[in-house]
UniProtKB/Swiss-Prot annotation:
It comes from the Eukaryota. PROSITE patterns: PH_DOMAIN, RHOGAP, SH3, WW_DOMAIN_2. This is Rho GTPase-activating protein 12. SUPFAM superfamilies: GTPase activation domain, GAP, PH domain-like, SH3-domain, WW domain. The record marks 693 as: Arginine finger. It comes from Macaca fascicularis. Disulfide bonds: none annotated. Residues 657-845 form the Rho-GAP domain. Residues 463-575 form the PH domain.
Amino acid sequence: MKMADRSGKIIPGQAYIEVEYDYEYEAKDRKIVIKQGERYILVKKTNDDWWQVKPDENSKAFYVPAQYVKEVTRKALMPPVKQVAGLPNNSTKIMQSLHLQRSTENVNKLPELSSFGKPSSSVQGTGLTRDANQNFGPSYNPGHTVNLSLDLTHNNGKFNNDSHSPKVSSQNRTRLFGHFPGPEFLDVEKTSFSQEQSCDSAGEGSERIHQDSESGDELSSSSTEQIRATTPPNQGRPDSPVYANLQELKISQSALPPLPGSPAIQINGEWETHKDSSGRCYYYDRGTQERTWKPPRWTRDASISKGDFQSPGDQELLSSEENYYSTSYSQSDSQCGSPPRGWSEELDERGHTLYTSDYTNEKWLKHIDDQGRQYYYSADGSRSEWELPKYNASSQQQREIIKSRSLDRRLQEPIVLTKWRHSTIVLDTNDKESPTASKPCFPENESSPSSPKHQDTASSPKDQEKYGLLNVTKIAENGKKVRKNWLSSWAVLQGSSLLFTKTQGSSTSWFGSNQSKPEFTVDLKGATIEMASKDKSSKKNVFELKTRQGTELLIQSDNDTVINDWFKVLSSTINNQAVDTDEGIEEEILPDSPGIEKHDKEKEQKDPKKLRSFKVSSIDSSEQKKTKKNLKKFLTRRPTLQAVREKGYIKDQVFGSNLANLCQRENGTVPKFVKLCIEHVEEYGLDVDGIYRVSGNLAVIQKLRFAVNHDEKLDLNDSKWEDIHVITGALKMFFRELPEPLFTFNHFNDFVNAIKQEPRQRVAAVKDLIRQLPKPNQDTMQILFRHLKRVVENGEKNRMTYQSIAIVFGPTLLKPEKETGNIAVHTVYQNQIVELILLELSSIFGR
C-alpha cells in the first residue's frame, strides 16, 4: 500500500511520527511498507515495540515498529503565507538556483566583532531575509540564482557611494526581489553579499538556499533563511556597531538601549531596570556595562546564579537572528511583560499561554516556532498572526473593561505552586495575568511589591486568597469518624471557604477556567486549626482542621515552607472571621446617635412624600437587621454535634450500632429489624432453595440498609424488597457490622476451649458461657437460632443443612478481636460451635 507523503498537511496539536529506517511486513489483509522520511499520524503507543499510526484522518490505522520511527514534536498552526509581487517571467535568467537551507559552512568560525559585540561594517551575504509576514510570490522562479555584492561602510548612517563593488540599481533590485508591501526588516549584522560575479559558479562563495523537505514545513512566513556573517581580512573594526538604513529595500534595525541617565527603577544583583524617553523598559549591567531590551535570565529563573549570566563572550555564540526577533517582538508586546491592551492572559490546562479578548471573548494561543520566534493562532485553528489582533472598542466598552480590571488590582501574598516532579515555586500575584512573563516594571507612582505599602495591602485578610497542591484526608464527617484516604487535591482559599478540587482548572483557581467542580468545601467560620499529633498521622508536616459542622481534616505537604504558609494563612483567616462576626454583632446592638435622629426628624418634616417611602424602607431594613442578628447569634451559639447527640436530638443508626444501646433505645432486648426480617423469611422464604446461602443484590441491600438507618417506615412486602435474598442478605449484614459480635470478644477463647472438650461436656460448657453473655445477646441469639432451626427442618425444600447454616453464620456470629495466623483453625471451631447450638437447641435454651 502507498504510505503517507512527507509533505502532507500538518494538523495543529496532532502527534506525528517520522520513519527513520525502511521497513516492510505482511499484515493479514495487506502489505505494509514504510520508507525513510515519511510521516504518519500517531494514533496510539500500544507498547514499547509497536505503535499504531495512520497516513491521514480518513485512512485505516496499522502498526509500525517503534524502534524504526521517532516521534515528531507536535506542530502548532503556522502563520499564513502572504503573497507578494513576484519576478516577471521574461526576466533575464541570472538565477541558476535558489533554495532554502540552514547554513553550516561557518559554524565554527565566528565573525569579527566590534566593541559592542556586533559584526563589522563590511559584510558579505548571498541571501535576503524576509519580513516576518512576507513571502516570495507565486511568480518567483526557484530555478534562478543571483550573486550580489554591496560594500556597506558606516558613514553617519549612510552608505558610501565610492564602493568598488558592483552596484545594483533599484530597477534591477525590484526585478530580482519583487515588491515587498509594508515595512521590510533586514538585519544588516547577519546579511552578507558575495563578491563573486560569476553566475555559473555552482555554489562557490554563495549559499544555496533550498526548502528542507525533511522538516515538513512549507515555504511560509514562519521559516527564515539562515544568513551567515563574515569579515574580509582587509577591513578594520569600527568604533561603534553598524546600523544601515537601506531606503529602497525598506530595511530597519533596532538600536541598543541608551545609557542610563536616571536612577534605576529596580535593582537585582548587577542588573538595573531603567526606562527610556518613551517609557520602554530596558536592562543595564553595571559590571559589564551591557544593555539589552530583552529581560536577563534572572527575571525568568530566580534560581540561576550570577555565574550563569551570559557574558559578552557568550553572546558571540548567539544567533543574531534570535536577537533580532526578540528585539522586534518586544516592541509589539507590552513593555513590562503584560498582555496588550484589550487582552487578558492566562494558562490553559496544558500550560500553554492563552489570550482572551476583552471585547469579543475570542481565544488565541501563543506558540514558538522552530526558529525561536513567537506567534499567535486562534483556538479553533482558523487564523494565525505574528501579533494579536487589534479591536476598536467603543468608549462604553473600554470603561466597563477598565472598571472590571480595577476590581482585580488587589495585591496579594505570593501564590505557592508545586510543579509536578519539580520543586515548589513562589509566584507573585502581580504575575497572574502573565505567568510566563518577566519581572514586571512598576510606574514611578506605584509601589513595588517589596514596599511597606504593598505588604499592608497584601496582608489584608478580607482579600486573602491562596492556591496550591496539598495532600488532604477526612478523619471525621458530621461528627462521625471515617476511614483515612489521602488524596492529592488542588486547594483554593477564597474568603472564609477552603475548596478542594481534583484538578487545577477550578473556577476559583487563578487560571480562571470553569471546567472543574470542587470535590468538597470547608467553611472556616468557627473552625479550629492545630498541628496534628503523631497518633493522628505518621506523616510529617500535618495539621488538623476542625469545623463547626463536625468535619475534621488532615492537611499535609512534603514541603516545610508550603505547609507553614498554609498554616499561617488559615490561622489568620479563621481569627479574622471570628473578629468580623463579633464586630458585626456589636455594631448592630449599638443605638443610633441623637444627632442622627434629630437630623432625620428635620428631614421628615421638610419632605412628607419621602417620609412614607423612608418609613417602609426603614422597617424592611430593621427586620433584615433583626434576622441577621438572630442568625449570627444562632451560628455562634450553636452546640456541637456531639452535644446534640448526647441530648438525644440525633439518633444513632441501626446498622453498626452497639447491640445493647440499640435495644435500650428501642425499649426491648431484641432489635426490631431482626424480628422483622425473621418473620418475613419464615412467612415467604422457608421453601426457597439455598436460603441464606445465596447472596442478594448488594445495591438493593444497601438501599434497604439506608431506609432502616433513616427511620423510614419500612414495609418488607413492598415490591422493592420482593427478592427474599435481599432480606436475608440485610440480616447477615446487620450481624456482620455489629461493633462486637453476638458471641462477645472476651468469650471467644472460652467458646473455643469448650468445643474442644469431650462431647458430653461440650453442651454444658457452651450453655454456661451463653448465660454469661449480656441479656440482649442472649435473647437475640435465642430467637435467631430458633429461626435457623426451622430453616433446617425445611431442608427437603430449601436443601439447607446444619453444616451449611453453620458455614454461613459461624464467622459472622463468632470471631476474635484481633485476627491471627490461625484463621483456618478458628473457622473450623466457629462452624462447630454454631452447629452444636443448632443440634442441642432445646438443651441450651429450653423448649
